[in-house]
Swiss-Prot record:
Binds 1 [2Fe-2S] cluster. SUPFAM superfamilies: 2Fe-2S ferredoxin-like. Ferredoxins are iron-sulfur proteins that transfer electrons in a wide variety of metabolic reactions. It comes from Colocasia esculenta. This is Ferredoxin.
Length: 97
């Protein structure tokens, strides 16, 4: 399946189609959207965002705890879309504050 992902970035909103077997960060790069990242392995907070609408599968990640995931935090480098959704990006400072 392919889902519509909307990213709310500091420079505006961007929408793209993301297959359910491609990480959101990787697909964003494919379509020319620059997002922050560092480890690309779900073990840091550089790519952190917040899910506003929809759902993701980020079971490959290890940095976030269950409480943070429950609050909507997402690591875009290890997140697959499982529905159409909206994610606020560039949230590392807020997450680690």
């Amino acid at each position: 399946a392919t889902y519509k992902v909307k990213l709310v970035t500091p420079s505006g909103q961007q929408e793209f189609q993301c297959p359910d077997d491609v990480y959101i960060l990787d697909q964003a790069e494919e379509v020319g959207i620059d997002l922050p990242y560092s480890c690309r392995a779900g073990s840091c907070s550089s790519c952190a965002g917040k899910v506003k609408v929809g759902d993701v599968d980020q079971s490959d990640g290890s940095f976030l705890d269950d409480e943070q995931i429950g609050e909507g935090w997402v690591l875009t480098c290890v997140a697959y879309p499982v529905s159409d959704g909206t994610i606020e990006t560039h949230k590392e400072e807020e997450l680690t504050a």
